From Swiss-Prot:
Component of the ER-mitochondria encounter structure (ERMES) or MDM complex, composed of MMM1, MDM10, MDM12 and MDM34. A MMM1 homodimer associates with one molecule of MDM12 on each side in a pairwise head-to-tail manner, and the SMP-LTD domains of MMM1 and MDM12 generate a continuous hydrophobic tunnel for phospholipid trafficking. It is found in: Mitochondrion outer membrane; Endoplasmic reticulum membrane. Residues 106-133, 387-402 have a biased composition (Acidic residues). InterPro entries: Mdm12 (IPR027532), SMP_LBD (IPR031468). The SMP-LTD domain is a barrel-like domain that can bind various types of glycerophospholipids in its interior and mediate their transfer between two adjacent bilayers. It comes from the Eukaryota. It is a peripheral membrane protein. This is Mitochondrial distribution and morphology protein 12. It comes from Candida albicans (strain WO-1) (Yeast).
Amino acid sequence: MSFDINWNQLTIDDTINQSIKEFLDQQFKNISLPSFISNLAVTDFNLGEIPPEVTIRHIGDPFEEFYEDENILGAMNEANNDSKDEHLKNHGDGINKDSGYNSQNLDDEDEDDEDDDEDDEDEEEEDEDDYDDHDLGTINEGISLLNFNENSTTPSANSFAGSAAPPLPPPLNPSRDSFHSILHPYGVNSIIGATGAGSETPTNILNQNYLSSRVLPKISVKQKQPHHDDNDIQLIVEINYKGDMHINLLVNLLVNYPSPNFISLPIKLHITDIVIHSIATIAYLKKSVFLSFLCDVDDTFPDFDSNVQTPTSTTGGNFVDYYSNDATINKERIDIVKKIKIESEIGEVENNILRNVGKVEKFLVEQLRNILRDEIAWPSWICIDMNDDDDEEEEEESEDNDGGNSDLNDNDGKHGDGRTDETEAGE
């Protein structure tokens, strides 16, 4: 399932471009710069005119972590309290109107309620036992459903390829759907079981042995809470972007020999040809939209329906390539920016300065990738609050009403010929 994005609506107004530019500029100012550069600033950002290709891969309930957002939780609690108050009020009115109730009826009902409570507690204990059995299946649930390639060299593929059980349909309960069953067809298993130290990434999260011996990851299955709304929805989408977005930066290149800051040379850097191919989640709940990137898509995965070939690593020039054919290197679960090109504007200088320019380019690309990963890669996300638009509309309507009332008050007591009331004229 796919859909078209009206990308022009994002580029007509320059507000979005300006906001993203200010955000990136602030993020770059917060990082520690190496000794050979200074005064790093983002001077321009443009989304471009080419939209990404977005394909819906899964539809279900939003992740529980999105409900932990303070604004969302506060709004939901307020709505729940209002509904409870209304329910109690209606329930109380019904009791007062019913003359058939007496003390004996109430006592009998209390006894029945106690019996019902005991039955409910027994049922809840049974449900909790069943629920506990599924806790460790948060990420790995559905691993046996995967159809791995027998000849695959991926460690995780070998560990599950021997399963003789026939594939089963995915769970009907959306909250029980696993990351693994959703993301497997897009090359995620290529990073499962990888070695090397690192942070909490799917390299560890999607490893079954890791789950059985370590603390459960943050992503966990929880029972549906009262603050969930039936209209809440989450899309797991595949984003493939090869557009004309560009970022312009200005930085001073420093030569610290024979003394610190001996030469300061301004350099303009143009970042273009950005390639993004990732799986992301888009959740809509309580008039708020959440966006978070989950993992990169491996275009070389044999089950992935793509003819794209992995380009070889380039040498020289200003093209920075993140692809690596060395499986022994510990790969982060997500880069978001898979490929990028940097063009430098600099005058004629000595060769040692040009070598430093390459260092600057590599540093900036790494920092850009880190910023995106820290801000919009799971377990981080961005939240777009749609309630702000409603508040602005209400304020505008209120101002219009106040203006109309003010005009009426100004005209009150005046006649068409400009005379005041008779009492005032008499005085």
